[in-house]
């Protein structure tokens, strides 16, 4: 993701792994894209050969500003790392960076371009955050690095690099923008703000499990309705299915095993060849106001909860 602490994380990785074990993709023709990636990914468009070369040379990291689906099939989902930043701060910082390093563009034009408002959500391309190895938060960099190191068995050291000297001026709240512009930006960033809030909750969960000395389970509720609840659950490097407990209104409803094949998770190289899904159909459909929750049986980690909407008197 552009302007989300990537430079700091990259430098930490270079220090830990060495330049020879790090590859980068910042796009076609970008001088920071490494030669091997330029040759095999962009020129030959042969990702299979690229993966072979990376494995042969024991490359530790492939990083860059790339939509996740581009390289996700090459690596286990539990080894994929992304960082998100507060959407307005990312937008303002990215615009300032583009104006410094490339052709300056008015803010009103920039926010409508592909690299403008909502770029973080677009680069993730609807991939569930809970399926990734680590989703860090720029504003919580130290906590994110702690989770990253613990999850992947690393010892990366914190770096603070590539900061705009006028960073404080960029961290303006939304209401300081001109009224018409503020409304427009608010609408463009609505989905990304929800994604950012979700990523923060996920980081909270990871920290809680880390502090408790408990293993973290990747997982989430993907769908819930009056008739059924479904989702996925898995652990990194684990081949046996995760056992789950489903509750309805705080009472046990069912014990589940996450064994069902999910094509989307298979494409992401989730453990168990993507056989990590669960589904439960309610014998008695949920009623308005009913709540359900799914937790990991072994640790009590909450994977998700949902409440059946209550219709107002004016709704049909």
Where are these regions (language model features)?
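Basic, ligand-binding patches in group-transfer machinery
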Residues: 202-316
């Amino acid at each position: 993701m552009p302007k989300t602490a990537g430079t700091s994380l990259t430098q930490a990785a270079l220090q830990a792994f060495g330049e020879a074990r790090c590859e980068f993709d910042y796009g076609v023709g970008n001088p920071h894209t490494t030669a091997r990636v330029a040759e095999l990914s962009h020129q030959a468009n042969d990702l299979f050969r690229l993966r072979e070369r990376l494995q042969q040379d024991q490359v530790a990291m492939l990083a860059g500003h790339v939509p996740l689906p581009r390289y996700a099939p090459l690596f286990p989902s539990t080894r994929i790392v992304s960082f998100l930043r507060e959407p307005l701060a990312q937008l303002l910082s990215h615009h300032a960076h583009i104006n410094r390093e490339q052709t300056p563009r008015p803010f009103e034009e920039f926010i409508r371009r592909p690299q403008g408002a909502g770029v973080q959500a677009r680069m993730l391309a609807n991939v569930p955050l809970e399926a990734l190895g680590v989703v860090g938060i720029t504003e919580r960099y130290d906590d994110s690095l702690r989770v990253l190191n613990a999850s992947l068995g690393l010892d990366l050291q914190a770096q603070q690099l590539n900061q705009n000297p006028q960073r404080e001026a960029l961290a303006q709240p939304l209401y300081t923008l001109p009224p018409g512009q503020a409304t427009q930006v608010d609408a463009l960033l609505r989905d990304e703000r929800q994604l950012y809030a979700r990523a923060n909750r996920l980081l909270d969960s990871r920290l809680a499990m880390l502090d408790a000395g408990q293993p973290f389970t990747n997982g989430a509720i993907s769908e819930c309705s009056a008739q059924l609840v479904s989702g996925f659950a898995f652990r990194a490097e684990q081949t046996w299915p995760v056992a789950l407990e489903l509750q309805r209104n705080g009472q046990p409803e069912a014990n589940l095993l996450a064994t069902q094949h999910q094509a989307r998770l298979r494409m992401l190289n989730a453990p168990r060849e993507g056989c990590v899904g669960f589904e439960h159909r309610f014998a008695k459909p949920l009623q308005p106001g009913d709540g359900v929750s799914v937790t990991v049986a072994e640790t009590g980690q909450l994977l998700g909860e949902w409440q059946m909407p209550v219709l107002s008197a004016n709704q049909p």
